[in-house]
Amino acid sequence: MSRRNAAVKRPVLPDPQFNSRLASMMISRLMKHGKKSTAQRILSDAFSLISERTGGNAVELFETAVKNATPLVEVRARRVGGATYQVPMEVRQERGTAMALRWLVTFSRARNGKSMSQKLAGELMDAANETGSAVKKREDTHKMAEANKAFAHYRY
């Protein structure tokens, strides 16, 4: 274990185009091989597609989608006396948001569709309507935590 001080968390600056911290975080998650401008274009294209289809504010819909995909509890493996238990634990706000963004990107990539921006727009609209794979993943995570509630006293 490192004896040095813990690294200082840098604040996430809001994206200049959408003036949103979440959008900035999403761009970082979308980015592959350091191509940030490509990731920004994908997100802005997805937002314009969302605006066309819904006629509403795409950034607000995006924030709703992230909120709907954010888990409140998760299970973590804990070894006790030779047995490994799945212990349910609360998720901190930051980690929950990060997980939601990661799931949205992962399931967008897995979708069938033409371009990444279309797939991302579809996944975001589904998540905002409380359907879609990212929301299902959150529900599955909550079910796992509920099923393993008996091991909650092993929390650390």
Swiss-Prot record:
One of its GO terms (molecular function) is structural constituent of ribosome. It comes from the Bacteria. GO terms for biological process: translation. The keyword RNA-binding applies. Keywords: Ribonucleoprotein, Ribosomal protein, RNA-binding, rRNA-binding, tRNA-binding. GO terms for cellular component: small ribosomal subunit. It holds the Pfam family Ribosomal_S7. The keyword Repeat does not apply. InterPro entries: Ribosomal_uS7 (IPR000235), Ribosomal_uS7_bac/org-type (IPR005717), Ribosomal_uS7_CS (IPR020606), Ribosomal_uS7_dom (IPR023798), Ribosomal_uS7_dom_sf (IPR036823). PANTHER family: RIBOSOMAL PROTEIN S7. Part of the 30S ribosomal subunit. Contacts proteins S9 and S11. One of the primary rRNA binding proteins, it binds directly to 16S rRNA where it nucleates assembly of the head domain of the 30S subunit. Is located at the subunit interface close to the decoding center, probably blocks exit of the E-site tRNA. Belongs to the universal ribosomal protein uS7 family. This is Small ribosomal subunit protein uS7. It comes from Prochlorococcus marinus (strain MIT 9301).
